[in-house]
Amino acid sequence: MKILRPPFRALSDENGVTNTFFTVYVVELALRMSPMPISVQRKESGDAESVYQQVRQALEQGQPRLLEMTCEKVEGKRLSVLTSDVLAVQIYEKTAASGGSKRPGFSLDS
């Protein structure tokens, strides 16, 4: 018997085969004048929600300030961004099963 602890999750397919997937939570920022978003990953849902709320509160205050974030997935990855340049923030769950195929949000692709 295998004991799984978060962020691992076991899923069974229609044939009864059990697969284990690693879940990571992504906090993604859309920046002014930048075509590509920046993101940091968290291993726990609560930690990702905390980062999301931190960014959201900084946006609500309306005062430009420097916001620094670190990434749990990529060791040593650090981001510093001026809050006045952040246009949007989103949080989503990513598993090994979903890979990097399509991010949540709006898309012009059919």
Swiss-Prot record:
NCBIfam families given in the database record: PRK13683.1
Similarity field: Belongs to the UPF0367 family.
Matches recorded under InterPro entries: UPF0367 (IPR020885)
Protein name: UPF0367 protein sync_2587
